[in-house]
């Protein structure tokens, strides 16, 4: 049981995935990033069900979530180095014997018939020899494991690319055209199509285990769309969502490699909140209420010239 408890922090410490702040990167976007953004957006737009708009003239309104911001990542996971590093140091017992030289001093004193002799022995204050003896074993041991955590100091700034919105809008228009739906200016349209792009960006992440490492780059596109008939105010397409993500991943062993590189495109999680369950209030008197039929000539929002153009007059 003790061994298991020791192995758990050893295996789990510094093992995890650190997800960086989504960013387009500085300067030019590199090819893999372009490929992923294009793949996720194409897949999401391709999934849009536009069968209810067959033969109609649609005015397209696309709104994209802003993608500007910045953030800091400071510090990280604790290092296992501070947990198990230790040392053992053993010194044998040591005894030193010093030999100090001795010398005798004799003094004789005579005065008339009296005399005295004084003899003294003194030691020098510096040893003439020293003998050191050690008993026992001498040993030194140390053990430790150092793992660099995934939390470095980082500062990333997201740079918005205004051409991304134009690219996505052109993709939507292309799909409309290929489906046989004509996209026209608002004054010539009989249908309004609203597309709200909630998610349109990338996510970078790094997985660091003791033996396995991976670099992952994902691009996600999530959108919601609906269509309204201008004459009847009827919902031709109730709010629907389309969400796809593309991924590029490099896998390493002890950060050697990559031994595997993969690309995937798959359906992503839907929006956390969508408008598919919203219905009009039962007592509403608004003229633009969905499914409320009215005469265009009595609609103050539509001019006579607009009606004439719709009818081809």
From Swiss-Prot:
Indicate where this protein is primarily found: membrane
Q: What is this protein called?
A: Adhesin MafA 1/2
Q: What gene is behind this protein?
A: mafA1
What is the protein's membrane topology class?
Lipid-anchor
Region spans: Disordered: 282-313
Keywords, alphabetical:
Cell adhesion, Cell outer membrane, Lipoprotein, Membrane, Palmitate, Signal, Virulence
**Signal peptide segment:** 1-14
Subcellular location as annotated: Cell outer membrane
Biased composition regions of type Polar residues, renumbered to the chain: 282-298
Native source organism of the sequence: Neisseria meningitidis serogroup C (strain 053442)
Signal among keywords: yes
Determine if Transport is one of this entry's keywords. Answer: no
Query: Which chain positions have N-palmitoyl cysteine-type lipid attachment?
Result: 15
A single BP term in Gene Ontology: cell adhesion
One Gene Ontology cellular component annotation held by this UniProt entry: cell outer membrane
